[in-house]
């Protein structure tokens, strides 16, 4: 091979080597540029997401049927946790627990976030069927809970009383005795059970029944049987039935009270009309 050909070949190899080195270097530089861009962008996005000034949870949407819960109840519950977080950082489970603990009349609450700045809260309240020991309420499942008095003052509900932890037992007795009385158009206004399981009832006409312990349904049936006779005697004497004590094997002890003035006048007018 001639010297000229050899020189030409070496020159081509040098050019090719320079090109390969240049390409490799360009590839490395490009990769480093991409990685740097990704890292910087990722850091920037993370900071942007955590920046409460960029994505604050500033809108509150409440759903669900509400009778006792006010918007401010929920707002104050959330604010008690401190400054609201961002869409990405706020833990909805913490808000849910906070509402359940601060608002005892809430049966169920679900909290979720909606992009970009909305907090949606769905509430389910307990539905009371009676008042329990004056300070609380009880629902159909025997759950007791409290509601601010000013929000329940207009509700007319039966009154139930019993030892602590006996709400289910009292509620069951109230239902059973109420169903029996309803057949004769009586309504239970109040039912109370003592720690010794002794029962006292108050009817819608304010007659008090003392049933004592045991055989409550049998004693209640005795009252229903005696009532027409007692009512007739009350009208004859111009009095009203105050209480009926049924803690006997048979019969009952009856307490009488004067008629209210308006009822007494009405009864006198009715008697005079019948005589004319």
UniProtKB/Swiss-Prot annotation:
Entry annotated with the keyword Transmembrane helix: yes
Chief subcellular location: membrane
Bias (Low complexity): 266-276
Subcellular localization(s) per the UniProt record: Cell inner membrane
Transmembrane stretches, start-end: 28-48
Pfam families: FtsQ_DivIB_C, POTRA_1
Keywords: Cell cycle, Cell division, Cell inner membrane, Cell membrane, Membrane, Transmembrane, Transmembrane helix
Domain POTRA: 55-126
One GO-annotated biological process of the protein: cell septum assembly
Region (Disordered): 255-276
Topological domain ranges for the Periplasmic compartment: 49-276
Coiled coil segments of this chain: none
Ranges per topology, Cytoplasmic: 1-27
HAMAP family assigned to the protein according to its UniProt record, in alphabetical order: FtsQ_subfam (MF_00911)
Function: Essential cell division protein. May link together the upstream cell division proteins, which are predominantly cytoplasmic, with the downstream cell division proteins, which are predominantly periplasmic. May control correct divisome assembly.
Assembly and interaction partners: Part of a complex composed of FtsB, FtsL and FtsQ.
Family: Belongs to the FtsQ/DivIB family. FtsQ subfamily.
Protein name per Swiss-Prot or TrEMBL: Cell division protein FtsQ
Organism: Shigella dysenteriae serotype 1 (strain Sd197)
